[in-house]
Every structure is written in C-alpha cells, then in structure tokens.
C-alpha cells in the first residue's frame, strides 16, 4: 500500500510526523537550521527537484516549515540561486515579481506597490497591453486573434458598418451654445487625437467623425464640460470615448495615494480615472466592448461592473487594473460600500442616457456617487452628459453636475432618423399575431426586433413564433443576466433572427444590422417609441419600423403624427381621424406635450431661453414663474395657463392644457402613464 501511495517520490513511510506551522509562527520555534535536502520529498509540487527544504533535511523533531525564510513568490524578479524557498535571496517580499512575471526586479514595468490595481506609474499588463514608461506611452504588441475578436473582419455581419446614407450626416444641423465654443474637427487627425487612438479608429473601419463627434472631440479635449443631445445611432459612444482615451494616452495614469498599497503589493481599491454611468446592464456591456476596442494595445485597462452578474469575477477584473470604469449606478454604490472602489482620482465623469437613468429612479444613487463620495468636485473634473433627449427637468438637474458647459444639439433631437421607413397599421389586439406573421413572411430577411410591453407577453409571443417555425428568442427583466446575454448573442449572430423584447433593450443597445423593428405594443411615451425604432437605421444604414396602433394607443396619436411629419413619413388617414376625435382630451403622460415634451424645450439650451415653461404646448418642465391664472400648469413644473384650444379646467385649479394634462386624466393628476378616462 505504501508503494502504491508513493506519488512523485513522496514517501509516506519516512521521517517524523509533520505538523502545520502557521505563517506568523514560522522561524520562531527554535531548532537548528536544516543542513541538506530530505531524501523523500524531491519532485513534489512544494519542493523543486534537488531543493526540497532549501538547505537540508528536516531534523528529527524539528519544526517542519518553521525555519523557512520569508516567502518570495515566483517570477523573474525572484532570486534564482536556490529556487523558491532558498534563503540565499533577500528575505523581504519582492513586489516586482508578484503579479507581473514579465518585469525584471524593480524594472519600470512592475505592477507592484501603489501601481497595482489602479493605474500605477509604471505598468505592464498581460494580454498584449501597452504600458506607460518614463512619461511615454508604449504600445503593446499586436494580437491577431484579439484584433479579430474586437474589430471583426471586412464585411463582418456581427459588426456595424457604416451604411449608404452615412454621408448625409453632414447635412444634419448642429447647434452649439455656450461661451467660446471650439471649432469642430472634420477628420480623425493628430492634433487633437492621439496617434495610437487614430490607429484603433482605423481598425474599427471608421472613416469620418459623425456630427456629434466632430463637436464633442474638440470640446472635451479643450477641458470643457458638455451636455450633448443627438439622435440615437449617431455615434454618441465614440463622442465621449475618443477624447477621454486620447487624453489618457497623452497624459498617462494618475498616481495612486501613497497609503493605498495593501498586502503583497496590491491595492484592494481600484482608482479609476474615468467613470461612465449608464442605466442598463446591456448598455454598460456595450460601452465596455467599445472601450476595449479603442484602448487596444494601450496602457488603459477598461472594466465593467453591473448587477445581476457574479461580483467575484468583477472584483478580480478590477484587481488586474481599472483605469476606465463602466458601471450601472446600483452595483457601483455596492462596490463603494465594500471599499473596493475609490473615486478620488476621477478626471472624467460621463452620464450616458442620463434622462433614462433618472426615469428609472437612479437619481439618489447618482447624487450619492457624484456628491456624497470622494469624487472630486465639479470644478476639479470634467463632466459629460449624453442622451438622445434632454428635457428641461434634466437640464435643471445638470446645473448641479456641470460647470460652464457647452450645450450641443445635433439634428432634430428627440426625433427619428429619415433613414427609417415608418409604417403605422391599425390592428386590434386580437389580430396582432396574424398580422405579425404576415409581416415576418413578407420581410423575412435580416434581423427583426419586436417590442412588447410586458414580460409575460415577451415569453408568450416568443413561444408562439417558435411554434410557427420562426427562430425567435426573448429578453426581459426577469431573465437572468446569462440568459439575456445568450439571447442577445444568438440574435446578433443570426442564429435567432427574431428577438422579442421589453423596454429593457429599447435604450442605447447597438445591435448591428437590425433591418426591421416592430412595435407590437406601442408605448405610452413617445420618447420610448423614438428609442425603440432607433435600434434600426443606425450609422447611416436604412431600416423599417412597423407600429401596431389601435384606439387603446390614442394617448400618443398627436405626438406620433408630429413625429411622422418631421421625418417626412406617410401619415395614415386613421391617425388623423382619431386625433380629431380626441382633440382637447389629451391622455397618457402627454409625451412631448407634457413635462418631457417639445414645449418643454427637449432640445434647447434652457440658459438661452430662461426658465420659462409656460409657453409651448401644455407648458413644460422647469420653473417658468407662476401661471397667469394662479393655478398649476404644465406637465412638469410651474408652467403657464392651459392652451386656449384645449378645454382647460377653470382658472385656479390643477390643469395643464386638456382634461388629460398633468398626469393622465382630469381629476386624477397623479396617474402618470395611464390612459385618459375619455
């Protein structure tokens, strides 16, 4: 039996029984130093060949590991004289060897000391990353496999390519307001962009900047705060990533506080220099993928954290380095409370889809992150807000986060792209499934995204389509993060070309080559409709949108007609008839006409137009002074008197233009999002 158990020369019969000595007791329990290697331990994992106990056999009655020297981990910086347990080397821990095998002892590329987890001054990281050395950015080696993963190949169907209408972006009107607005850039050139970033932009097959990028790059590179509104699919992500990464490549990492180094030379906390907040797990994952693409071969290490995923793997990712952090507000607050993230080095704060984050109730977390933790104040950081809509209530909130900012409005903000052909069909609820099958048979090619209002309907409709031999899948808030990521991946690569989704996928997701969006259930807010159909017609490509409309959706009929007119789309006669029937009886949230509406200045810089919210259609958000009638007007603040054409309630009472104003129905102003009782 003993012979059978003699593994790798580990003889179980020889020597005295060993006892475990805790690390803090080793070397303190007496006994002579060992004099030679034991005969029976050679070849085991704990004792390299010929050097089992470093300097000799364990004496009878000795202390086992008690006399071993201080541990020095393996690595090029470890002494080579006697392998890992040899006391001939220095007795203290060699920080350069741990976690950075490529670095020599004390070399400039070491990740030890304060430079470990937060972007130290001389960092070389695995996976072909670059490093910052002697005040210069040194790019890492090329990695063909990683390049294919990040950038794809020419005409790769899983990567978004610019479409036939991309050049038309030059015709989109741009309004930039603020003091000393810098001139736009027309090409990706140096200056202002770093050469390394330009190479990565070329790898991504981007030829010319979009309108939002033309203006945002010089604004951010000039050190200004920015509030940018641009229609969805217009390159907002590149609008903030390009200048942030370019300046990081030029200026290098920030020093980590001297007391930040923990045991074994690691910092337990991450000290990112850039923080990007977004509302959904899918959107932060998408921004993270883009940041990996443009930080390729650089010293910048992007990280992503979001709820619903394993926090342990996210912590391990941050320990390997975290310079640019993409996060959802909830998970970020959790990690701050755990003491794993410090915001004191933040140079750039980005709020993407800011209006949706506030709509989803993230305002307390955002205010805590920005104002209640150790983030530098508004004067000591750059803050950028990006979204497809920026109603006045969001602009008023932005005053707390931004300083002397430039307001950038690109195109008809909050509107839809003319690249999208919009069709509205009158379909009763009972007929929706059969009409959907007709559409799928007619427009079968390409990826089709179907939006429904409820999680149950998403699963039900997906199962129905599968039973009709259409390969479909679904995503909604009740599916686990792994299920959602798997469904999105199958949709992206075309294995399931039909995706049924709730609003969780409506905002910000950039799914390449979606050719058709179907609004099976129309939303009650026209802004949600804008973002849903914005999943197609991206980057200059064309797309089709079909909406199923019936009298249950009459709350958005006027906003829908206005939207179709703006985009030069055909307006069905039944829409105009229903709009005339309901004139003056506005329902729903009011959409554009309520607190978030066009009358609320959703795409205007409120600094230029005062706080006035009483003008326009049904008033607007913000504080526009007391209304002339003495009552509450407007959908979102102290607006003006009700519009004269809209059967407003008597002066001095709650109202906002129309019996459905204010929140949903006359006599029930708090019923936000509901249908009019009329």
UniProtKB/Swiss-Prot annotation:
Where in or outside the cell? Answer: Cytoplasm
Record-listed E.C. numbers: 3.6.4.13
Sorted alphabetically, the keyword list is:
ATP-binding, Cytoplasm, Helicase, Hydrolase, Initiation factor, Nucleotide-binding, Protein biosynthesis, RNA-binding
Q: Give the matching InterPro entries.
A: DEAD/DEAH_box_helicase_dom (IPR011545), Helicase_ATP-bd (IPR014001), Helicase_C-like (IPR001650), P-loop_NTPase (IPR027417), RNA-helicase_DEAD-box_CS (IPR000629), RNA_helicase_DEAD_Q_motif (IPR014014)
Tell me which residues make up the Helicase ATP-binding domain: 217-408
GO CC annotation:
cytoplasmic stress granule; nucleus; spliceosomal complex
Q: Name one GO biological process term.
A: positive regulation of formation of translation preinitiation complex
Outline the segment boundaries, as ranges, of region: Disordered.
1-137, 585-678
Report the residue ranges that make up the Helicase C-terminal domain in this protein.
419-579
- The UniProt annotation puts motif Q motif at 186-214
The family database entries (Pfam families) matched by this protein are listed as: DEAD (PF00270), Helicase_C (PF00271)
Q: Does the keyword Amino-acid biosynthesis apply?
A: no
Q: Where is the composition biased (Pro residues)?
A: 641-652
Binding of ATP occurs at 230-237
- Composition bias type Low complexity, residue spans: 1-15, 73-87
Gene3D superfamilies referenced in this protein's UniProt entry, alphabetically: P-loop containing nucleotide triphosphate hydrolases
Q: What does this protein do?
A: ATP-binding RNA helicase involved in translation initiation. Remodels RNA in response to ADP and ATP concentrations by facilitating disruption, but also formation of RNA duplexes.
Q: What is known of its domains?
A: The Q motif is unique to and characteristic of the DEAD box family of RNA helicases and controls ATP binding and hydrolysis.
Q: Which family does it belong to?
A: Belongs to the DEAD box helicase family. DDX3/DED1 subfamily.
The protein's name: ATP-dependent RNA helicase ded1
Q: Give the originating organism.
A: Sclerotinia sclerotiorum (strain ATCC 18683 / 1980 / Ss-1) (White mold)
